[in-house]
Amino acid sequence: MAAALFSSNGEEAIGRNIDIGQVDIQSSPEKDLGEFYEIEKTVEFIQRNAAQKVALQFPDDLLLDSVKVARKLEEATGAKTYILGDTSYGSCCVDEVAAEHVKANVLVHYGRACLSPCCRLPVSYVFGRKAVNMDLCAEAFLSHYRDTESHVVVLSDVVYDHALGELAKRIRSAYPNVIFSKLTSCGETASPDEIVKFGRRFSPDLRLWPESYGIFYVGGEGSTLNNLMLTWPRCSFFSFNPFTGEGRTEGLHVNRALMIRFYLIERARDAHVFGILVGTLGVSDYLSALKHLKNIIHLAGKKSYMFSVGKLNPAKLANFPEIDVFVLVACPENSLLDSSEFYKPVVTPDEMEIACNPAREWHGYCITNFRELLPGGSAYVEFPETDPSDAHHTDVSLITGNLRSSHLTVAETLEKDSDTSLVQRNSKTALAQMSSAASYLASRSWQGLDKALGQTPVVKAVEGRKGIAIAYEDEICS
């Protein structure tokens, strides 16, 4: 029972409700199987890597076809295939840990993907070629961008990326300033004039980007579109949903979403104890990110604890009431978590840094890729050296209106040895050092059993009560 509070079991995976509002979960016909799942491309990938064991990672909505695909690949390559269903975290991430359990040589990821860089196994992505009505898509673009000189970047959900080539043929001749994004692959280096975000790359006119650009997005509502809008809130967005065949102007809720993120930053500024949530084990540099966050929190004079609990839900995190704010280290697709259902706020590493690092300021947009915050990243900001005279200062909380104290760690105190690792207390148990954990313990109505050493007489063990709770032997039953 206790283990279920911290990790997901098999019954939960089987009984999980899938959002099928815009998902076609019917099994694909045999004649379309090879095209939809790109069987020939996958066979070439397996043979090129001389793989004997192949892990096939399917999301829930594509599991119906998993056995058919596995059989076709085994017949064509002779390799042994292993189907990976329920993932440890988000289905958009490559589950390298599960692939290593079966000692796979390569991994094939099916369905939507966050395209986060991986470092352990060769990975091939098969997004699934979802159908797009190109007539309606082109019509939506032409009706919205009537000025042929408009500067537009065309982005898409990965499952519709195959349709961008056809869209380019229809509109590029009339719109010279339209740019079509391309998906990136591991190992590619970006040129100085390129923008690389969320596994997509494009080269806008940097003198006009982003204020003078519009973004035409092919895909439905979801985390991908939300991330794009919160990353570039100064761009005007227009989306075409292939599932409904309709286009619409986006952006009415962006300002509200940014206000919510700013509120979470203020909650993080008020926090004394942070919980670092491990939301991925496959994205490259996640260990460096965990170490970086722990260091930033320590330099800010606050406490941190690390948790790895698999898929997140309110019940799991409610087991840690001592935590003021949780920091989620995950892929960009899963970083912006709606924490309204959780008892404590869940923020991104960028929001945590804004709250703890005096040198980092709120920039008006979201950074969901934690790799950009690491040393050498495009958004890295070094924690400033703290002068001992400025180590303690106060400001006013915008949420509670109360004064809050900051206790920045002076650089010299980071060097600790065995002689200074303990603090000797006096007989009066006077407070020797401020501790957020101790202050939380003092505020609790029940602080645990008091041993009261030396205050109670020592007695021999006596025979206790017998029976069950409903009726002990010494109780009179009616």
Swiss-Prot record:
Cofactor(s) of this protein: [4Fe-4S] cluster
Example of a GO biological process term: protein histidyl modification to diphthamide
Cofactor remark from the record: Binds 1 [4Fe-4S] cluster per subunit. The cluster facilitates the reduction of the catalytic iron-sulfur cluster in the dph1 subunit.
Disulfide cysteine pairs (residue numbers): none
Key words of the record: Iron, Iron-sulfur, Metal-binding
GO annotations of cellular component type: 2-(3-amino-3-carboxypropyl)histidine synthase complex
InterPro entries assigned to the protein according to its UniProt record, in alphabetical order: DHP2, DPH1/DPH2, DPH1/DPH2_1, DPH1/DPH2_3
An example molecular function term from Gene Ontology annotations: 2-(3-amino-3-carboxypropyl)histidine synthase activity
Binding of [4Fe-4S] cluster, residues: C93, C114, C331
The keyword Iron is assigned to this record: yes
Pfam families attached to this UniProt entry: Diphthamide_syn (PF01866)
Domain of life where this protein originates: Eukaryota
Pathway entry: Protein modification; peptidyl-diphthamide biosynthesis
PANTHER family hit by this protein: 2-(3-AMINO-3-CARBOXYPROPYL)HISTIDINE SYNTHASE SUBUNIT 2, DIPHTHAMIDE BIOSYNTHESIS PROTEIN
Family: Belongs to the DPH1/DPH2 family. DPH2 subfamily.
UniProt-recorded name of the protein: 2-(3-amino-3-carboxypropyl)histidine synthase subunit 2
Organism: Xenopus laevis (African clawed frog)
